[in-house]
């Protein structure tokens, strides 16, 4: 995976990193191997630096190197504040989102919320163990902002789906997306806009939500907005 990424697939890394379908080929896909220690961060970093020196496509490799820096940063941060697995980093948020709506949570976990991209992402990660970064962030944001559920209610479930589960990255990112760090900008992803931006033809959605396979690309992102006549056809 590392060899094919550095020599071929990385060319479209920067362009496709946020797209749920294309990222499956354009991202490195080495995260599970880093998680389980099959390859070390030092090996990956040194190989990337060497490839960047020799390649004509330097920009995507520099972009990837920055992500490696982030990886190390968040793991080190977790070592310093391991309580973030259970507690809000900013305790001022302890008084909000205290109740769990089991119906909402079940729909989110099973990919049956009725929001196409959300459901496609959850079904995909449940079956394959992989999802690109932006879509992971969107799942966390949707749970905590749109469904208004405490992040703790969904963090463990999502962690169990990942082949590359890394506590240091997972919990810090989940808190960032839920807005409980107290220092990061609150991120609220519009799942309909994300679908149109990152999966415009609806390829990813139709693959994982076959119920929408026959819906046009124009309507697949928000089928609830279809005129009643077309929805019945």
Language-model features, listed with the residues they occupy:
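Long hydrophobic alpha-helical segments that form multi-pass transmembrane helix bundles
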Residues: 1-13
């Amino acid at each position: 995976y590392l060899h094919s990424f550095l020599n071929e697939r990385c060319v479209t890394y920067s362009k496709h990193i946020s797209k749920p379908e294309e990222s499956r080929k354009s991202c490195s896909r080495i995260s599970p191997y880093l998680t389980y220690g099959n390859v070390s961060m030092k090996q990956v970093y040194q190989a990337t630096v060497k490839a960047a020196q020799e390649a004509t496509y330097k920009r995507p490799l520099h972009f990837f190197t920055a992500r490696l820096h982030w990886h190390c940063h968040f793991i080190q941060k977790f070592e310093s504040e391991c309580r973030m697995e259970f507690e809000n980093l900013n305790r001022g948020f302890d008084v909000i989102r205290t109740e769990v709506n089991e119906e909402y949570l079940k729909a989110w976990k099973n990919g049956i919320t009725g929001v196409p991209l959300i459901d496609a992402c959850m079904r995909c990660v449940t079956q394959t163990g992989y999802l690109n970064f932006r879509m992971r962030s969107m799942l966390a944001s949707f749970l905590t902002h749109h469904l208004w559920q405490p992040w703790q209610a969904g963090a463990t479930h999502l962690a169990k789906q990942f082949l590359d589960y890394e506590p240091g990255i997972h919990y810090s990112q989940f808190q960032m997306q839920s807005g409980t760090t107290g220092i990061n900008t609150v991120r609220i992803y519009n799942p309909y806009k994300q679908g149109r931006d990152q999966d415009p033809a609806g390829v990813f959605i139709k693959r994982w939500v076959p119920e929408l396979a026959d819906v046009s690309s124009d309507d697949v992102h928000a089928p609830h907005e279809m005129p009643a006549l077309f929805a019945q056809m």
